[in-house]
From Swiss-Prot:
Tetramer of two alpha and two beta subunits. Its cofactor is Mg(2+). The gene is pheS. It comes from Rickettsia typhi (strain ATCC VR-144 / Wilmington). This is Phenylalanine--tRNA ligase alpha subunit. Keywords: Aminoacyl-tRNA synthetase, ATP-binding, Cytoplasm, Ligase, Magnesium, Metal-binding, Nucleotide-binding, Protein biosynthesis. Belongs to the class-II aminoacyl-tRNA synthetase family. Phe-tRNA synthetase alpha subunit type 1 subfamily. Mg(2+) binds at E259.
Length: 350
């Protein structure tokens, strides 16, 4: 009995002085482990002949074991609380320290320009249509009245991909006119929408990049004529540049998908040079035929513009390639604040 009380007192003294969980675990093994002090006492049962003595001794050993276990358990709780308090003290936040400056992102000039262009067309009742970047030869060329030997179909102008769709070559769309074809095939006239998005051509210099952004517009209805086209283009240009005095001229041109076709030039002031900004024309009858629209009942006009071109003119950016270089200094100079998004109520932005 005296030996059991001595073991309990020794355990209490040692565990009381422990300051970390690692040392506590070592004492647990020392007293309750396979070769520990309490286990060694328990082995003495085999030397006792009297059954009653064995029973009483076994009960005392088990009681000792439970007491030491409870002491260790209580110490574990104390040490864990101490560790948590130390961690909280080390991690506490000083509310008097000035906060780090919040870094807010900004709007890329192409995104800003795209938003402004869309808002202008929204004033004229245009909706938005979207389509895939990967197209087949039919939607990108054939349905738009491109001849099979047209230079635009060549590898040096178009990015062709491996694989085919409905036995037609796959490619990265070279214009968003593909969206017009899909929309006309899947819907019924009248139509009045724009198709903004990325386009791809094998070209790279100061005025061309392999990937660029376009907005193409389409209007299909009864009794549509060139006068409607000119009205929309003139109103659009003057609204976007916020200059009612911009001069415009329509030059005869050629596009496979429009007839007659024109290119539009502008100049801000009388002494400025004329600058080409977009192409347009009346939708070619073959295009209407290819999408199942009655050419004798419906007519329409289409136009297409490069978003980068309009951004360069409006924001006075000289080199097209700078849009895609990721130069932080350049982006900080030409960026737009997130609250500087155009809206119909507040008008256009800088």
């Amino acid at each position: 009995m005296a030996n059991i009380e001595t073991i309990l007192k020794l355990a209490e003294e040692k565990i009381l002085l422990v300051h970390n969980l690692k040392d506590l675990q070592e004492y647990k093994v020392e007293f309750l482990g396979k070769n520990g002090i309490v286990t060694s006492e328990l082995k003495k049962l085999s030397s006792l002949v009297n059954g009653q003595e064995r029973k009483e001794f076994g009960l005392k050993i088990n009681t000792l074991k439970d007491k030491i276990h409870n002491i260790i358990k209580a110490k574990v709780q104390i040490l864990e609380e101490e560790e948590l308090n130390l961690k909280l003290a080390a991690d506490k936040i000083d509310l008097t320290i000035p906060a780090r400056r919040y870094k807010q992102g900004s709007i890329h000039p192409i995104t800003q320009c795209m938003d402004e262009l869309i808002q202008v067309f929204a004033q004229f009742g245009f909706t938005i249509e979207n389509g895939p970047n990967i197209e087949n030869d039919f939607h990108n060329f054939t349905a738009l009245n491109f001849e099979y030997d047209h230079p635009a179909r060549q590898m040096h102008d178009t990015f062709y991909l491996k694989g085919r769709e409905n036995d037609k070559p796959l490619l990265l769309r070279t214009h968003t006119s593909t969206v017009q074809i899909r929309a006309m095939k899947n819907g019924k006239p009248p139509f009045r929408f724009i198709a903004p998005g990325r386009t791809y051509r094998s070209d790279s210099d100061m005025t061309h990049t392999p990937m660029f952004h376009q907005i193409e517009g389409l209007v299909i209805d009864k009794n549509i004529n060139m006068g409607h086209l000119k009205y929309v283009i003139i109103k659009f240009i003057r609204s976007f540049f916020e200059n009612p005095n911009i001069e415009l001229r329509f030059r005869p041109s050629f596009f496979p998908f429009t007839e007659p076709s024109a290119e539009v030039d502008i100049r801000m002031n009388k002494n400025d040079k004329w600058l080409e900004v977009l192409g347009c024309g009346m939708v070619h009858p073959n295009v209407l035929k290819n999408v199942g629209i009655d050419r004798s009942e419906y007519q329409g006009f289409a136009f297409g513009l490069g978003v980068e071109r309009f951004a360069m003119l409006k924001y006075n950016i000289k080199d097209l390639r700078r849009f895609f270089e990721g130069d932080i200094r350049w982006l900080k100079h030409y960026n737009f604040e997130s609250f500087d998004i155009p809206n119909l109520a507040g008008g256009l932005t800088k």
